[in-house]
């Protein structure tokens, strides 16, 4: 296709992927499947992210620190699925040459393209930062003592982290207009927004891999170290099935004039004893989670790097990389809620039929969970 380096630049800076086909009529028929994919992702992502936000805001038990970061990511993904994807789907279905806004938007749609790019950049940046905050929260939950965790994740600190994610994303988006190519100007040799996007994705991937693989390593090396957290949702985290069965019983209340003393650990039923297959399944779950992030983000990293250095990138590769990255916004709620018992109970109370089907599907791979009385609710179980 003609002028492939400039088109790849437009894609990386957040412009419409579908509008890249305007320069060549032969691509017109290939925009329809991409538009249909965007439509499906927009509908599914809007419903899924909206449902998670509604459940967390409606049910007290779901209002935990970790879920606050999940909701933050769902809000960002909702803006992408409900506001940006429908525009891409509609613009891709328009005839070639008519997919630009009226002439009062810079005569060639430059302002409208920049607006859509800013909306996409804001949503994706906050979403990726939220993934990092969730991973870091879970990693510190495993590797730090309960008192340290409580100090780090006080209410004001959590609110500050959420606000910082939006402020940082907004600051990065505001850098786009000065770097946007001027109409009629020759494309630059180095496209800094593309390189910035690639660097951000690489940093996010490194942090996620460090946190989740660190969780698996810490649990396998020292289950006793993890058990002191006494966190009632710990067994639902990737790689933590072995730790769930090692939780001590809650300490006895102090008697008159006496000090509190820990209860003698009671033997667990045979059904709750950790099995090698269950530990292997939990290790596999964290690897699958990491693979999802790698599959969704790494193609866009290489496309962004190539675009940053003005290397030609085929339109199909650009389309696939963006669709994979956008699919992460639609699948974000499922990554964190499909094995969470509290979420499943909340869904069953709202949508009985759907909740029962989801519970049956998750039960096939779920690790046996311990009761709340056995696991306790200290540290990370604190509510907002």
UniProtKB/Swiss-Prot annotation:
GO cellular component, one term: cytoplasm
One GO term of the biological process aspect: motor learning
Its membrane topology: Multi-pass membrane protein
Glycosylation sites: 3
Tissues where this protein is expressed: Expressed predominantly in the striatum.
Side of membrane Cytoplasmic, spans: 57-73, 137-158, 217-285, 332-384
Gene knockout outcome: Mice have increased locomotion, increased motor stereotypical behavior, and impaired motor skill learning. Mutant mice also show facilitated hippocampal-mediated behaviors and decreased anxiety. Chronic blockade of delta opioid receptors and mu opioid, but not other Gi/o coupled receptors, using delta opioid receptor antagonist partially improved motor coordination and normalized spatial navigation and anxiety of mutant mice.
Transmembrane segments: 36-56, 74-94, 117-136, 159-179, 196-216, 286-306, 311-331
Domain of life where this protein originates: Eukaryota
Annotated compartments: Cell membrane; Cell projection, Cilium membrane; Cytoplasm; Nucleus
Pfam families: 7tm_1 (PF00001)
Residues in the Extracellular compartment per record: 1-35, 95-116, 180-195, 307-310
Residue ranges of coiled coil: none
An example Gene Ontology molecular-function term: beta2-adrenergic receptor activity
Residue pairs linked by disulfide bridges in the UniProt entry: none
Main location: membrane
UniProt entry keywords in alphabetical sequence: Cell membrane, Cell projection, Cytoplasm, G-protein coupled receptor, Glycoprotein, Membrane, Nucleus, Receptor, Transducer, Transmembrane, Transmembrane helix
SUPFAM superfamilies tied to this protein: Family A G protein-coupled receptor-like (SSF81321)
Family named by the database record: Belongs to the G-protein coupled receptor 1 family.
Function: Orphan G protein-coupled receptor implicated in a large repertoire of behavioral responses that engage motor activities, spatial learning, and emotional processing. May play a role in the regulation of cognitive and motor function. Couples with the heterotrimeric G protein complex of the G(i) subfamily, consisting of GNAI1, GNB1 and GNG2, thereby acting through a G(i)-mediated pathway. Plays a role in the attenuation of D1 dopamine receptor (D1R)-mediated cAMP response in ciliated cells. In on-ciliated cells, involved in the inhibition of the beta-2 adrenergic receptor (B2AR) response.
Descriptive protein name: G protein-coupled receptor 88
Organism the protein comes from: Mus musculus (Mouse)
